[in-house]
Regions:
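Glycine-rich anion-binding loops of enzyme active sites
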Residues: 22-38, 63-159, 298
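A generic local secondary-structure boundary/capping motif
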Residues: 7-9, 17-20, 55-58, 91, ...
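Small-aliphatic-rich amphipathic alpha-helix that forms the alpha element of a beta-alpha
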Residues: 42-68, 85-96, 174-186, 196-205
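N-terminal glycine-rich phosphate/pyrophosphate-binding loops that anchor nucleotide-derived ligands
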Residues: 1-59, 134-139, 144, 162, ...
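Glycine-/charge-enriched secondary-structure boundary and capping motifs
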Residues: 75-100, 107-112, 184-185, 194-311
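Acidic-glycine-rich active-site phosphate/pyrophosphate-binding loop
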Residues: 18-29, 172-178, 243-254
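Active-site glycine-rich loop that binds ribose-phosphate moieties when present
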Residues: 117-127, 161-182, 256-258
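Short coil/turn connectors at secondary-structure junctions
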Residues: 3-6, 14-15, 23-28, 62-67, ...
């Protein structure tokens, strides 16, 4: 446990970024993320990884300031052109976010890895955490899910080009607009949906907020091809582990199949924001943001299980 009074959130919480208090109500946010390629195109991989790294700042209501590259690359095995394309993808996505990449660190490694350290800023009274959800709130999810299943299918050469393109477009999309729209409406809790899957991150919100959530499966949107692929047996190991964990804290409708439950727990890369917000503001958000954002459920008083999935 960190005893420094300037530290607001750190590794002991399940929030999306480290937050340190400066002065005059200002705070610094910092996060780091990197991973191995999940698509074949180097430039697209760089874009996706950068968008994923930036997401944690947006999920806390912060404004990114600058970033550093983290690079691992097998310099003796792969062409420098591939590395240049990866880093160009990251640089272009950072530019879209309005920030520079000002440095970084690289090592020789057996497998390519790429990501960013991102530093952001915010006003302390305005930051979001996952601990403020209140009974009566509506839950909004801003992107479809299914990237883990599709990424696994890409590696197995089981994904069509149309499915790959759809998932890549979703993963490349910054959560910038969603965060900016939400900042006008003061949501009660926000997180981004990433490695623990939708249900896993929702469990974190409910436990941190001492509430429960009621989700309508039929309102959740899945990426093109994700349902077909899981029905064909494409099941990422991380997503299965997520489901094993979620079943200890979730009441799943008996009408849901194993594959449907797995989709809800699919580990995401550069997923959307999960927003807990008052009903009147939820409607405003959906009208202003547009896109593929949907209301997927509501927050309720605490029950034994933090999450219930209806069908």
């Amino acid at each position: 446990m960190n005893t420094n009074d300037s530290v607001i959130t750190d590794y002991t919480s399940t929030d999306d970024a480290a937050v340190v208090r400066l002065s005059d109500g200002k705070i610094i946010l910092q996060t780091v993320d990197f991973f191995t390629p999940i698509v074949d195109d180097p430039y697209t991989f760089g874009q996706i990884s950068a968008a994923n790294s930036l997401s944690d700042i947006y999920a806390m209501g912060g404004k990114p300031l600058f970033a550093l590259n983290i690079v691992a690359f097998p310099i003796q095995k792969l062409s420098n052109t591939i590395l240049s394309e990866i880093m160009q993808g990251g640089a272009d996505k950072a530019a879209e976010a309005g920030i520079p990449i000002v440095g970084g660190h690289s090592i020789d490694d057996n497998e390519p890895k790429y990501g960013l350290v991102v530093t952001g800023e915010a006003i302390e009274k305005n930051i979001w955490t996952n601990a403020g959800a209140k009974p009566g709130d509506h839950l909004i999810l801003t992107k479809p899910i299914g990237t883990g299943i599709i990424s696994t299918a890409i590696k197995k050469e089981k994904a069509s080009q149309a499915v790959t393109d759809s998932a890549s477009e979703s993963m490349k999309e910054l959560n910038k607009k969603a965060s900016e729209v939400a900042q006008h409406l003061q949501p009660n809790a926000v997180t981004d949906v990433t490695g623990f899957g939708l249900v896993g991150h929702l469990i974190e919100v409910c436990n941190a907020s001492n509430v429960s959530a009621n989700i309508d499966f039929k309102e959740i949107e899945f990426l093109h091809g994700a349902i077909d692929l899981v029905n064909e047996g494409i099941m990422p190991g991380g997503s299965k582990r997520n489901l094993d964990h979620a079943e200890n804290f979730t009441t799943f409708s008996s009408k849901l199949s194993f594959n449907q439950k797995l989709l809800l727990c699919d580990a995401q890369t550069s997923g959307g924001l999960l927003i807990s917000i008052q009903p009147k503001d939820a409607e405003k958000f959906l009208n202003e943001f547009g896109g593929k954002a949907k209301k997927i459920g509501e927050i309720e008083p605490r029950r034994v299980n933090p999450v219930t999935i209806n069908f």
